[in-house]
Amino acid sequence: MPVQVDDIIKLLCHVSDHQKMKATIKHSARGALVAAAGAFLGGLVGGPPGIAVGGAVGGAMGAWMTSGQFKPIPQIIMELPPVQQQRLCDDIYTIVRTLDWTDATQLIMLVMGNDSLKQKVVAALINYMTKELQAEIQYGD
């Protein structure tokens, strides 16, 4: 059976929604840019001491801007570029390849009905999110 990307994407969206999984993608480059801009502006206004103050203020602002931007994992999965979706599906397919399914609904039922399989799918999804996307996972509302 060829890898059916749409079915696996729907499975991942269902499983992550069922687990109430959210993630935040680390935007460290944006935070670093804000910190650098703060240091630069501080240096222009206050000289060498201004660099320290501006860097501290910019760093705090950068940290604040990049923290707590949690999005539901189904939304993140749907927004992935096709190449990353394919890579994620390949990872999950290694887990579900022995199953025989005809559509996404049947695949979801097969996985959700088997706790061991469901745990493996969730673990692979978390692994992909944390390793490939450098995401931080959160459960619940």
From Swiss-Prot:
Residues spanning the membrane: 33-53
Subcellular localization is given as: Mitochondrion; Mitochondrion membrane; Endoplasmic reticulum; Cytoplasm, Cytosol
Keywords for this protein? Cytoplasm, Endoplasmic reticulum, Membrane, Mitochondrion, Transmembrane, Transmembrane helix
Keyword Endoplasmic reticulum among record annotations: yes
Give the way it sits in the membrane: Single-pass membrane protein
Q: Name one GO cellular component term.
A: mitochondrion
Source organism's superkingdom? Eukaryota
Record's signal peptide: none
InterPro entries linked to this entry: C19orf12
Instruction: Report the sequence similarity comment from the record.
Output: Belongs to the C19orf12 family.
Write the protein's name: Protein C19orf12 homolog
